């Protein structure tokens, strides 16, 4: 603006004085230069990033015009400076505007936490300082753990920034410079070579045998061959052969191109923006705890209101009744609940860690219990990400199948249908076919890993399975014609190493290209003329293998190109992981639907889907393009029936997950690539692969499978279901005990009767209620039958109707039994004695212990779950029992608790009466079992 103002002022001055002074030549030139510079600045500011779908259609000349760049000399420093003002640096900026202290305070925005804090304040006002400290400590522990989990989960954005390589080779002012990748702007000319990580989205203008590993971006395991020719149609990102994307890796060859998108304007920038905008959803357990907090709040205020009303009717002082009501309400709140929930979740996490599953966020453990949909990426998750040859067809009609997965060399080659295992050249036709694949090859297998292209590695392993792994050493390579995306084949010319002989060509590639170079076909080691009928037969076999989702390679050999002998076809696929098929079956039987969401083509996805039992006769598949074109509401209605989603981008995956969540599903997403990271974050449960997963996917996920074992999800689901039931067991015990204790005190207060329990006895009951017996219910081992149960509904709360009925039933039995003993032992004058309170007190404690025993399971009898299964529970109950006996019989404690000795008959009576709460609970379980058998067998809920 300063230059422009100066220029206009000078023009005005000259205009005023043109009659008196002629314009000097150097001034004219200066004005022209300044005017040109202003135009150049305006022009540079109009240069915009170009979407890959548009850039792929542009010719070299159109690209140069669009970005105002000379393809031979690159941008000038002046142009770069102006463009940076518009486009910024080529990097991702993480927004850390919210301070840490605010994030910590946000953890207190939880109804149960707020209720507990309120209880702590009331405890201080009523001078119950011990209660106040214990409640505050429990809240502090729970809040701190939650904060740490959330703080760690924000690292996924930081990991994504590591995908931008620190340096690159860029052409500027006619010179190739090694510079920081963050300096790139749209229009820069970047040079690429083998091993480079691509620094921005680039439209290629020059290519030499360029292969790019895009597996972290598209999910495709096979490297993509690249070209510099314009494309007629944009298509999806995985088909853009003349565009390379930020963060992907040059596997071989070299190239040069124009930067079309930097930073957040690149495709990885789109992923970054989606991850930044995506919020991790609340888990069902968090929602249940929130609801429980609200229910307990209503219950607490109900007690206060009821007592104040009764006190008002009886004419008692308002303040004293309010104080009693508040104290009882505080006592009713299970302050031990957050700690028990946390301990239960931590123990679940530790158990899962032993099964090689790492959980990063505690509530996620329980969320698995209500997961009813698992959306899984294909490559590296359902499959091993190890290309493997599975089928062979020779030119003379022999068919063979190959066993063994991966690059270990373990497995056999069997002729069909005889299942005869063949080695070496037992079958000449198969031997020659395998030999050609091994010799026309640049891959090396070392320590069960491939060095080179995965497809070539599969051919080397195939040779190893036939004891032909070293046959390549029998030849001396004299020439190589490398593979290119245009010709779709590669060939080598070799000579025998040990003896004089003629050179021979070995070729492999696409069938339609290889057959074009053949004039003969192999028939048991004898070359015969390649007739149209024979060619048609081979073409049909190639189509048949392709329809099974196999990558088909044709092989040939001969003295010269154009006179080769066709040898046959090899079918290669990335096979399913071991145990995946069984896991899918078990999950389906337990009401969990497994869906494949992949960037691969339909044929490949269906082949894997059929192999693992994902696809049935009513299979429905949906492309990423269809997902994008369908409105969210309509998509939510359709996704329930779809088993396979193919050709999907990161944006499509998120849309699919949102649609499933909208339809009421709890969705787990498994993945290993950067392209999965946004979906992993938006899903209710994000599951990343520990070995093959990228750092970005691991940080975005909240669960990691250390060994990449999909079947470990079964154990995780089982654990999640068991944990929720353990939490319900604890809540049932604590609420039934607290309601019974409160009711006894409330009834005695309202009816002007002596209290069955004194202050110290109530304190002892509270210790048992919140102490070891209660805590040990949270560590009950997971029920092995949990996996067979269908996923629980998201709407199911901890305090549901069935649990409330059980709580009220247990509380009623405890109240009735304790009042019976109190009434039986109270003297005729109605005054309470030490024996009266000792009997009532011991009766209540015994009821508590039997109630805890019945709360170990909501559905199974004690003999089914095993009396000695939870040893911590037994030790805690035994400790509580010994403590109670000490309170009764130890003279120092008798003075503190105002108790006296009881006879053996007294203890026998109390034990028999207290066991009624346990017996009644077991009878109720038997009755429910009888009713469930009487009803017709119900199907599991429809898989979502």
Curated annotation (Swiss-Prot):
The keyword Manganese does not apply. Signal peptide: none annotated. Keywords: ATP-binding, Calcium, Calcium transport, Cell membrane, Golgi apparatus, Ion transport, Magnesium, Membrane, Metal-binding, Nucleotide-binding, Phosphoprotein, Translocase, Transmembrane, Transmembrane helix, Transport. It is an enzyme of class 7 (translocase). One of its GO terms (cellular component) is cytoplasmic side of plasma membrane. Residues 69-93 are annotated as: Interaction with ORAI1. Belongs to the cation transport ATPase (P-type) (TC 3.A.3) family. Type IIA subfamily. It comes from Mus musculus (Mouse). Residues 126-127, 251-291, 351-748, 824-835, 894-903 are extracellular. It catalyses: Ca(2+)(in) + ATP + H2O = Ca(2+)(out) + ADP + phosphate + H(+); Mn(2+)(in) + ATP + H2O = Mn(2+)(out) + ADP + phosphate + H(+). It is found in: Golgi apparatus, trans-Golgi network membrane; Cell membrane; Basolateral cell membrane. It comes from the Eukaryota. One of its GO terms (molecular function) is ATP binding. Its EC number is 7.2.2.10. SMART domains: Cation_ATPase_N. Expressed in hippocampal neurons (at protein level). Expressed in lactating mammary epithelium (at protein level). Mg(2+) binds at residues 672, 676. The modification Phosphothreonine is found at residue 262. CDD domains: P-type_ATPase_SPCA (cd02085). Residues 1-104, 149-229, 313-329, 770-802, 854-872, 925-944 are cytoplasmic. Pfam families: Cation_ATPase, Cation_ATPase_C, Cation_ATPase_N, E1-E2_ATPase, Hydrolase. This is Calcium-transporting ATPase type 2C member 2.
């Amino acid at each position: 603006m300063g230059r422009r103002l100066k220029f206009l002022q000078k023009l005005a001055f000259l205009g005023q004085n043109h009659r008196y002074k002629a314009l000097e030549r150097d001034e004219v030139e200066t004005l022209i230069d300044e005017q040109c510079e202003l135009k150049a600045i305006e022009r540079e500011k109009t240069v915009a990033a170009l979407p890959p779908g548009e850039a792929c259609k542009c010719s070299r000349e159109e690209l140069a015009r669009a970005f105002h760049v000379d393809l031979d000399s690159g941008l000038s420093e002046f142009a770069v400076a102006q463009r940076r003002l518009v486009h910024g640096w080529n990097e991702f900026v993480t927004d850390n505007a919210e301070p840490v202290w605010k994030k910590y305070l946000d953890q207190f925005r939880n109804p149960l936490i707020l209720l507990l804090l309120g209880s702590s304040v009331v405890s201080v006002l009523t001078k119950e300082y011990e209660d106040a400290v214990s409640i505050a400590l429990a809240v502090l522990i729970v809040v701190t753990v939650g904060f740490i989990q959330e703080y760690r989960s924000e690292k996924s954005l930081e990991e994504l920034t590591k995908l931008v390589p620190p340096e690159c080779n860029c052409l500027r002012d006619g010179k190739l410079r090694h510079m920081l990748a963050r300096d790139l702007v749209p229009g820069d000319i970047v040079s690429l070579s083998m091993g480079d990580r691509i620094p921005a989205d680039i439209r290629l203008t020059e290519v030499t045998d360029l292969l790019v590993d895009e597996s972290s971006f598209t999910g495709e395991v096979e490297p993509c061959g690249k070209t510099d020719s314009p494309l007629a149609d944009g298509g999806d990102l995985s088909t853009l052969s003349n565009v390379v994307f930020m963060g992907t890796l040059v596997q071989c060859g070299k190239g040069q191109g124009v930067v079309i998108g930097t930073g957040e304007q690149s495709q990885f920038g789109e992923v970054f923006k989606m991850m930044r905008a995506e919020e991790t959803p609340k888990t069902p357990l968090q929602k249940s705890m929130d609801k429980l907090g609200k229910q307990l709040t209503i219950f607490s205020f109900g007690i206060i209101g009821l007592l104040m009303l009764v006190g008002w009717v009886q004419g008692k002082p308002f303040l004293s009744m309010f104080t009693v009501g508040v104290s009882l309400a505080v006592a009713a709140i299970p302050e031990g609940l957050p700690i028990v929930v946390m301990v239960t979740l931590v123990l679940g996490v530790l158990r899962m860690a032993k099964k090689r599953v790492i959980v990063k966020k505690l509530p996620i453990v329980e969320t698995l219990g209500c997961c009813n949909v698992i959306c899984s990426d294909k490559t590296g998750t359902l499959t091993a990400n190890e290309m493997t040859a599975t089928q062979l067809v020779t030119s003379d009609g022999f068919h063979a199948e190959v066993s063994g997965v991966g690059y270990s060399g373990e497995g056999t080659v069997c002729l069909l249908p005889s299942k005869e295992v063949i080695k070496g050249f037992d079958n000449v036709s198969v031997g020659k076919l395998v030999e050609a694949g091994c010799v026309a090859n640049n891959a090396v297998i070392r320590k069960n890993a491939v060095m080179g292209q995965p497809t070539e590695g599969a051919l080397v392993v195939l040779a190893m399975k036939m004891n032909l792994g070293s046959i390549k050493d029998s030849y001396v390579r004299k020439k190589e014609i490398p593979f290119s995306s245009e010709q779709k084949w590669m060939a080598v010319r070799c000579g025998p190493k040990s003896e004089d002989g003629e050179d021979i060509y070995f070729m492999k590639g696409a069938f339609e290209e290889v057959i074009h170079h053949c004039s003969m076909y192999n028939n048991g080691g004898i070359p015969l003329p390649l007739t149209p009928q024979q060619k048609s037969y081979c073409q049909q076999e190639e189509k048949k293998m392709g329809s099974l989702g196999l990558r088909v390679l044709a092989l040939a050999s001969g003295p010269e190109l154009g006179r080769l002998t066709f040898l046959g076809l090899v079918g290669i696929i990335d096979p399913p992981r071991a145990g995946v098929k069984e896991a899918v079956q078990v999950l389906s039987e337990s009401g969990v639907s497994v869906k494949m969401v992949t960037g691969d083509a339909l044929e490949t996805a269906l082949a894997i889907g059929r192999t693992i039992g994902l696809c049935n006769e009513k299979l429905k598949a949906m492309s990423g393009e269809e997902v994008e074109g369908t409105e969210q509401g309509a998509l939510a209605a359709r996704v329930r029936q779809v088993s396979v989603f193919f050709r999907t981008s990161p944006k499509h995956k998120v849309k699919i997950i949102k649609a499933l969540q909208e339809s009421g599903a709890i969705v787990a997403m498994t993945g290993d690539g950067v392209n999965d990271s946004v979906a992993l974050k938006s899903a209710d449960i994000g599951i990343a692969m520990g070995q093959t997963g990228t750092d970005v996917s691991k940080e975005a996920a909240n669960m990691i499978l250390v060994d990449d074992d999909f079947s470990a999800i079964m154990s995780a689901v089982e654990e999640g279901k068991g944990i929720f039931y353990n939490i319900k067991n604890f809540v049932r015990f604590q609420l039934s005990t607290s309601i019974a204790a409160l009711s006894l005190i409330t009834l005695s207060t309202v009816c002007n009767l002596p209290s069955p329990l004194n202050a110290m006895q109530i304190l002892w009951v509270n210790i048992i209620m919140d102490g070891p017996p209660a805590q040990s219910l949270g560590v009950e081992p997971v029920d092995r039958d949990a996996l067979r149960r269908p996923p629980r509904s998201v709407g199911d709360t901890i305090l549901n109707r069935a649990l409330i009925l059980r709580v009220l039933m247990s509380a009623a039995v405890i109240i009735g039994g304790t009042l019976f003993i109190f009434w039986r032992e109270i003297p005729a004058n109605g005054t309470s004695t030490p024996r009266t309170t000792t009997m009532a007190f011991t009766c209540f404690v015994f009821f508590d212990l039997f109630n805890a025993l019945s709360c170990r399971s909501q559905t199974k009898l004690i003999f089914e779950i095993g009396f000695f299964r939870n040893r911590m529970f037994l030790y805690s109950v035994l400790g509580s029992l010994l403590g109670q006996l000490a309170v009764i019989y130890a003279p120092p404690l008798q003075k503190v608790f105002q108790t006296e000795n009881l006879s053996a008959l007294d203890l026998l009576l109390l034990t028999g009466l207290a066991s009624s709460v346990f017996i009644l609970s077991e009878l109720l379980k038997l009755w429910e079992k009888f009713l469930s058998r009487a009803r017709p067998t119900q199907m599991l809920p429809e898989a979502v």
